[in-house]
Amino acid sequence: MDESSGQPDVHTYKSLAEDGPFCSVEPPKRPTGSLVMHSMAMFGREFCYAVEAAYVTPVLLSVGLPKSLYSVVWLLSPVLGFLLQPVVGSASDHCRARWGRRRPYILALGVMMLLGMALYLNGDTIISALIADPRRKPIWAISITMTGVVLFDFAADFIDGPIKAYLFDVCTHQDKERGLHYHALFTGLGGALGYLLGAIDWAHLELGRLLGTEFQVMFFFSSLVLTLCFIIHLCSIPEAPLRDTAKDTPPRQAPQDPASSSDRMYEYGSIEKVKNGYVNPELALQGGKTKNPPAEQTQRTMTIKSLLRALMSMPAHYRCLCISHLIGWTAFLSNMLFFTDFMGQIVYHGDPYSAHNSTEFLIYQRGVEVGCWGLCINSVFSSLYSYFQKALVPYVGLKGLYFMGYLLFGLGTGFIGLFPNVYSTLVMCTSFGVMSSTLYTVPFNLIAMYHREEQEEQRQQAQGGGLDSSRRGQGLDCAALTCMVQLAQILVGGGLGFLVNVVGSVVVVVITASAAALIGCCFVALFVRYID
């Protein structure tokens, strides 16, 4: 706060990508190879997600985690992500690192993912090597493993926002659409490969005997894939850094209407005014006569309170998109998090609570294995569908894709719940892939279109001498969408267990997923705003 004027501190940043004043520079068209390299981060992330889905439950059970702490493991990560996601998204909008705004955050979160995997896949081995007291070993093993799971989930959920914002910053609108389709394609391929490797019995293979256990084998593959994918991703497309121009320019006169300035300070997204290449157009200064170059960014000193107020004041069409994303992820996670358990108990009629050498438990394990193959089918079909999405858009538009994704998933899960047959269930897993591809592409395409429309409006206002008052950074908008994933995890983790206990059967899981998806159909058709 400046004591002499009573106004909040204001810093101005300028993108090194632009030189001329009053001109908005369109990023160059990106070759397919660069977009594929950019998508490798999604491949690596989803590969590690699949490994976690296949191994985290056996790992937690092997270290003796009490059932009372099981829900804590799955709730801690989304709660932390929901609270911190917008903060990091906003901070990345005005990061001044020399190699860009998004890549430093992506690198840090990638390292956190690697550390989380190291802890939850090797926690028991680490503790056995460090602690000799058998009475202390279980407590430390549980603590280390839980920390690893929470850290990995937190970073893996978190990283989606900066990756999407990175794509939006450096690409034209057409390349953004292409990039999102490649993201969905490689997300499915990464998940499929992760599930396939998780289905192999490494204990009876030479590599398993060499590394010790199948947990160490999967850590070897996961760390190798994740490291290579993120190196390729970070080298895919250069980012233009922001530089601080406050030291190079004389102080400006304070606005004549401080109250108006104070009100704008808490508008949605007003905590950062990013002008980095294609991200934002011309900026008209308050006062009317002087304009900043379009590559400038005005950043006010922010607090958590101001950030929350900014998010609460988001425009209606952004809010509706976030709600539809929340409904979609609630439906999707309701099914995916409990699908293998549904296969073991309902489809195969096994019993997870019986003795481990009993026929009922072995049948349950067989159902879980087949459920993993169903998730593999989901990943493969997600990749295929993401490829065909580009061909479908000219005919049905984004509205048709959004509606169709929710509808097919709702009908597919409903059919599985009503007719729990092995073969029909595996066939219906293709509808999971449609929903997955839809959630990873359409909402972010809409965000890109909203920003493109706002850029055109702001450019027209700047040419006409008007005042630009509705600027947002794409990092914050992507983070707001990603927050809905964490909120959906909180709702599913806290609510579905209660429903299962009340009903007495896990069939309520797929019925809930179906109902939520069909409600989402109505919402995306009636309330989400689409741009032709």
UniProtKB/Swiss-Prot annotation:
GO terms for biological process: developmental pigmentation; lysosomal lumen pH elevation; melanin biosynthetic process from tyrosine; sucrose transport; visual perception. Its main location: membrane. SUPFAM superfamilies: MFS general substrate transporter (SSF103473). GO terms for cellular component: melanosome membrane; membrane. Keywords: Glycoprotein, Melanin biosynthesis, Membrane, Sensory transduction, Symport, Transmembrane, Transmembrane helix, Transport, Vision. InterPro entries: MFS (IPR011701), MFS_trans_sf (IPR036259). The keyword Cell cycle does not apply. The keyword Glycoprotein applies. Residues 67-68, 127-138, 206-216, 341-367, 421-426, 501-506 are extracellular. The chain crosses the membrane at residues 46-66, 69-89, 106-126, 139-159, 185-205, 217-237, 320-340, 368-388, 400-420, 427-447, 480-500, 507-527. It comes from the Eukaryota. It holds the Pfam family MFS_1. It is a multi-pass membrane protein. One of its GO terms (molecular function) is D-glucose:proton symporter activity. Glycans are attached at N357. Proton-associated glucose and sucrose transporter. May be able to transport also fructose. Expressed at a late melanosome maturation stage where functions as a proton/glucose exporter which increase lumenal pH by decreasing glycolysis. Regulates melanogenesis by maintaining melanosome neutralization that is initially initiated by transient OCA2 and required for a proper function of the tyrosinase TYR. Interacts with TYRP1. This is Membrane-associated transporter protein. It comes from Sus scrofa.
